[in-house]
Every structure is written in structure tokens, then in C-alpha cells.
Amino acid sequence: MLEHLSSLPTQMDYKGQKLAEQMFQGIILFSAIVGFIYGYVAEQFGWTVYIVMAGFAFSCLLTLPPWPIYRRHPLKWLPVQDSGSEDKKPGERKIKRHAKNN
């Protein structure tokens, strides 16, 4: 039932994370200002809360899923380097012993 979910991308690059954070904060700030002004004019604090909550839900919808806009700059990983000491089995490694101070 959940097999198709494993094929969905779940990562975001660093520039995408920055963009998502800026969008999230901007939408919240905009909805707070609009909500405050409308609530002040209508003299209903409840409308202020509703507008801010709607802005929060909208910003979550835009920023929480890893949309393709947030994956435009994938990370370039370094290639794997062969190291002689890492390929040895644990029994083949030389054990470093510290000299005892008498």
C-alpha cells in the first residue's frame, strides 16, 4: 500500500531550504499584517486569528513538501577515495600501542 511513497523525493538542497524559509516567513508576516489591519477595521480579533491561521496553512502547503523548485541546485558530492588502511580486515591492521611511562 505504501510502496509508491518510497519513490517520492524527500530531499531539499540548501538554496531550496533558504528559499522555503524566506517564503514561510514572508507569508506569515504578510498574513499577520493583513489580519491585524482587517481585525482592527472590523473590530474583531477573531478575524485576525483566522487570517493568520490561513496564512500559516498556506505557507505550510507551499514550503513543507519538497517541491521541484526547492531541488534546483543538487549537492555535488566528492567521489569516494580509495584508502589502503580502510580496505584491510580488522586482524590485518597494525595496533598502535603507547609506551608506558615508568
Curated annotation (Swiss-Prot):
<feature type="region of interest" description="Disordered">
    <location>
        <begin position="81"/>
        <end position="102"/>
    </location>
</feature>
<dbReference type="GO" id="GO:0045047">
    <property type="term" value="P:protein targeting to ER"/>
</dbReference>
<keyword id="KW-1133">Transmembrane helix</keyword>
<protein>
    <recommendedName>
        <fullName>Signal peptidase complex subunit 1</fullName>
    </recommendedName>
</protein>
<feature type="topological domain" description="Cytoplasmic">
    <location>
        <begin position="70"/>
        <end position="102"/>
    </location>
</feature>
<comment type="function">
    <text>Component of the signal peptidase complex (SPC) which catalyzes the cleavage of N-terminal signal sequences from nascent proteins as they are translocated into the lumen of the endoplasmic reticulum. Dispensable for SPC enzymatic activity.</text>
</comment>
<dbReference type="GO" id="GO:0006465">
    <property type="term" value="P:signal peptide processing"/>
</dbReference>
<comment type="similarity">
    <text>Belongs to the SPCS1 family.</text>
</comment>
<comment type="subunit">
    <text>Component of the signal peptidase complex paralog A (SPC-A) composed of a catalytic subunit SEC11A and three accessory subunits SPCS1, SPCS2 and SPCS3. Component of the signal peptidase complex paralog C (SPC-C) composed of a catalytic subunit SEC11C and three accessory subunits SPCS1, SPCS2 and SPCS3. Within the complex, interacts with SPCS2 and SPCS3. The complex induces a local thinning of the ER membrane which is used to measure the length of the signal peptide (SP) h-region of protein substrates. This ensures the selectivity of the complex towards h-regions shorter than 18-20 amino acids.</text>
</comment>
<feature type="topological domain" description="Lumenal">
    <location>
        <position position="48"/>
    </location>
</feature>
<feature type="transmembrane region" description="Helical">
    <location>
        <begin position="49"/>
        <end position="69"/>
    </location>
</feature>
<dbReference type="InterPro" id="IPR009542">
    <property type="entry name" value="Spc1/SPCS1"/>
</dbReference>
<feature type="topological domain" description="Cytoplasmic">
    <location>
        <begin position="1"/>
        <end position="26"/>
    </location>
</feature>
<dbReference type="GO" id="GO:0005787">
    <property type="term" value="C:signal peptidase complex"/>
</dbReference>
<keyword id="KW-0472">Membrane</keyword>
<dbReference type="GO" id="GO:0005789">
    <property type="term" value="C:endoplasmic reticulum membrane"/>
</dbReference>
<feature type="transmembrane region" description="Helical">
    <location>
        <begin position="27"/>
        <end position="47"/>
    </location>
</feature>
<keyword id="KW-0812">Transmembrane</keyword>
<dbReference type="Pfam" id="PF06645">
    <property type="entry name" value="SPC12"/>
</dbReference>
<keyword id="KW-0256">Endoplasmic reticulum</keyword>
